[in-house]
From Swiss-Prot:
InterPro entries: D1/D2, Photo_II_D1/D2_sf, Photo_RC_L/M, Photo_RC_L/M_CS, PSII_PsbD/D2. 2 of the reaction center chlorophylls (ChlD1 and ChlD2) are entirely coordinated by water. Belongs to the reaction center PufL/M/PsbA/D family. This is Photosystem II D2 protein. PSII is composed of 1 copy each of membrane proteins PsbA, PsbB, PsbC, PsbD, PsbE, PsbF, PsbH, PsbI, PsbJ, PsbK, PsbL, PsbM, PsbT, PsbX, PsbY, PsbZ, Psb30/Ycf12, peripheral proteins PsbO, CyanoQ (PsbQ), PsbU, PsbV and a large number of cofactors. It forms dimeric complexes. The chain crosses the membrane at residues 40-60, 124-140, 152-165, 207-227, 278-294. One of its GO terms (cellular component) is plasma membrane-derived thylakoid membrane. Chlorophyll a ChlzD2 binds at H117. One of its GO terms (biological process) is photosynthetic electron transport in photosystem II. Chlorophyll a PD2 binds at H197. Its EC number is 1.10.3.9. It is found in: Cellular thylakoid membrane. It comes from Synechococcus sp. (strain JA-2-3B'a(2-13)).
């Protein structure tokens, strides 16, 4: 009698076959994340190129916004839907467009198309970094870092307009359109005086400063190879020894600041932490603006400036500037509301 001991070979199902094909070693890795990333990124980019080339914003904003109408790269945009569309997804087959592609473009359907596919594409790219990190056997901090720009995109383009009356108040997808949105944020929300914006600026600029300092310090402390320390030729990717001196770098900054990083892991984590945290904080701030939460208000200065013509601070001047932005932008940006402001309500500085 013969007894065979071992594991029963399981039948390979369709999932295993697809998994093998998706994770096959190729020039451009696909993976499961690619099923989300590649179609969504293709559709978002294609929708943006189509909109900026051919589609007008006349029916939604009363503006020209395409190359076909004479705009250039800095002034083209895929603009937000009309205010009257509310928060409709504006599906091509929905009640607004009723399957008419031309009408769908006219009412702003391309914006929701680009925004939603763009968000899913960014999420797919983050999942791609998770997937490849798992396959290669490294930690997933790249994906964690990429969550910061995703948070900014989702909060600005999706959550903020969801808190307002319609998609109309989101940024349009274009350079000048984004600039207009920044002015809108300042005028209607006093965004620059928001503490979450301050943390975002500190994170982004602080990250840039850390990057510049770190790169310069490494270049300063390269080990000599032969006659000199060569920036581009000396390093071999497979070499076992260090290519720069952490001890020398630590001594250098200790003499300048009196304090320096002595641990490479902590140093690089800090370079990750500063910009990522800053972007996350600014995203939280935008969610607050979606709920119309206010920034810092210094009411005592406003009251005194109103009572005393000779008293003015940079804060009160900025408040007047914000009022001017609102008074100018509301009629220009929302012509359908038919705003009319008499001269006496328009803001004037105390110097006037």
């Amino acid at each position: 009698m013969t007894i065979a001991v071992g594991r029963v070979r399981q039948e390979r199902g369709w999932f295993d076959i697809v998994d093998d094909w998706l994770k096959r070693d190729r020039f451009v890795f696909i993976g499961w994340s690619g099923l989300l990333l590649f179609p969504c990124a293709y559709l978002a980019l294609g929708g943006w190129l189509t909109g900026t080339t051919f589609v007008t914003s006349w029916y939604t904003h009363g503006l020209a916004s395409s190359y076909l109408e004479g705009c250039n790269f800095l002034t083209v945009a895929v603009s937000t839907p009309a205010d009257s569309m509310g928060h409709s997804l504006l599906l091509l087959w929905g009640p607004e467009a009723q399957g008419d592609f031309t009408r769908w473009c006219q009412i702003g359907g391309l914006w929701t198309f680009v925004a939603l596919h763009g968000a899913l594409g960014l999420i797919g790219f983050m999942l791609r970094q998770f997937e490849i990190a798992r396959l290669v056997g490294v930690r997933p901090y790249n994906a964690i870092a990429f969550s910061a720009p995703i948070a900014v995109f989702v909060s600005v383009f999706l959550i903020y307009p969801l808190g307002q009356s319609s998609w109309f108040f989101a940024p349009s997808f274009g350079v000048a359109g984004i600039f207009r949105f920044l002015l809108f944020f300042q005028g209607f929300h006093n965004w620059t005086l928001n503490p979450f914006h301050m943390m975002g600026v500190a994170g982004v600029l602080g990250g840039a400063l850390l990057c510049a300092i770190h790169g310069a310090t490494v270049e300063n402390t390269l080990f000599q190879d032969g006659e000199a320390a060569s920036t581009f030729r000396a390093f071999e990717p497979t070499q076992s020894e260090e290519t720069y001196s952490m001890v020398t770098a630590n001594r250098y900054w200790s003499q300048i600041f009196g304090i320096a990083f002595s641990n490479k892991r902590w140093l690089h984590f800090f370079m990750l932490f500063v910009p990522v945290t800053g972007l996350w904080m600014s995203s939280i701030g935008v969610v607050g603006l979606a709920l119309n939460l206010r920034a810092y208000d210094f009411i005592s200065q406003e009251v005194r400036a109103a009572e005393d013509p000779e008293f003015e601070t940079f804060y009160t001047k900025n408040i007047l500037l914000n009022e001017g932005i609102r008074a100018w932008m509301a009629p220009q940006d929302q012509p359908h509301e038919r705003f009319e402001f008499p001269e006496e309500v328009l803001p004037r500085g105390n110097a006037l």
